[in-house]
């Protein structure tokens, strides 16, 4: 006799998030969305400021104005302070995000982590490959291979806010995890490939400072007046070591504890991230964009973006490489692990998110400055290519996401519906008997109201009476 068929138990990928994870993602992305809009405003301001002849000189003067203690090796230009100083705050938050993902988020479970990690890695490797092939074919410089590898989550969310599209929580979490892993490998790329000379004395001091930072955290020492001065010292030593100073930010972020203990509502990492994220998204990143995105744009310059191998490689890497890398790896990973896409989503949704990830701005601009540090003209051309590629990726994503917007709106409404008004969306209470008892009580009251109205209408019809007050499902002017 044939053995009974085993039911299909294929693992679902990109399914609905747990309620705590959904709440965390929503809170994190809400701040990033506001920051993304500010980033967009700062970018437009920089482009206008740098391209109006009457204002162009003032932009250059402000960007190259130097200040800071020369004796400590910190007499830097405003643009330099923004790139090395303010972005350390951005990478500090990125470090906390990564730590949280590793100990309490999607990356905690190796099976769940495979998909976003593979997608992020391929989403960096394929753009780098596209850039390299373009420049080998066109006899250009391969120094900028890392420029199109990054995803800017804030800019991507700003695009979503502008076009009025709400992604389901699973897609938002996927995009956030992609960006977090992207940031991690971008940091490694900066540390490994863009560190030329190392001052080992300063590096040793920075490492010692990080050790003190870690020890104070483990001892439970509290107080910003302890950690902020120490963080500034570590940053200054890291800067003078020759290693990019933003590495100090991510290192300190990774040291924070992101798990809760008994009696704690939030972990120290979550608490500090909640305090610092608005500073990062609302001030640090927009100011970096203001002094980094101000490239002179002309018809000839835009034409060069599509003719010079270095700039064309950046554009193709962001628009084509990112999309193919993320979508292709996600599809192949699901196929070879015998996983199935959540029934709420389609592969077209993954393709749309992959194209949205082609918006590589903040980190791409930073790597562009590092890769072509000795060539001001090429640096500006690469910045223009980053802006152009990100704009094309945003337009492609807008079209793809708008096609699916009605479906997304329905999924978001399902995730937020709370008919029993207990503060928890109904989709998270389907297995809770108390929820069904509350819903049964609601429906019984609605049914009783319907019966009352029907009976009064019938009585009114027999006696030729007036209209019956009230409405089905209403009690005292409120839904039953």
UniProtKB/Swiss-Prot annotation:
Region Disordered, annotated ranges: 454-480
Gene Ontology biological process terms in this record: regulation of pH
Localization per record: Cell membrane
Membrane topology, record value: Multi-pass membrane protein
Domain of life: Bacteria
Catalytic activity: Na(+)(in) + 2 H(+)(out) = Na(+)(out) + 2 H(+)(in)
Keyword entries, A-Z: Antiport, Cell membrane, Ion transport, Membrane, Sodium, Sodium transport, Transmembrane, Transmembrane helix, Transport
InterPro entries: Na/H_antiporter_dom_sf (IPR023171), NhaA (IPR004670)
Keyword Transmembrane helix: yes
Statement: the UniProt record of this protein carries the keyword Cell membrane: yes
Pfam families named among the record's database cross-references: Na_H_antiport_1
Transmembrane domains' residue ranges: 34-54, 76-96, 113-133, 144-164, 174-194, 197-217, 223-243, 282-302, 312-332, 350-370, 381-401
One GO CC term on file: plasma membrane
Alphabetized GO MF terms: sodium:proton antiporter activity
HAMAP family: NhaA (MF_01844)
Similarity comment: Belongs to the NhaA Na(+)/H(+) (TC 2.A.33) antiporter family.
Role played: Na(+)/H(+) antiporter that extrudes sodium in exchange for external protons.
UniProt cross-references to NCBIfam families, sorted A to Z: NhaA
Record protein name field: Na(+)/H(+) antiporter NhaA
Gene name tied to this protein: nhaA
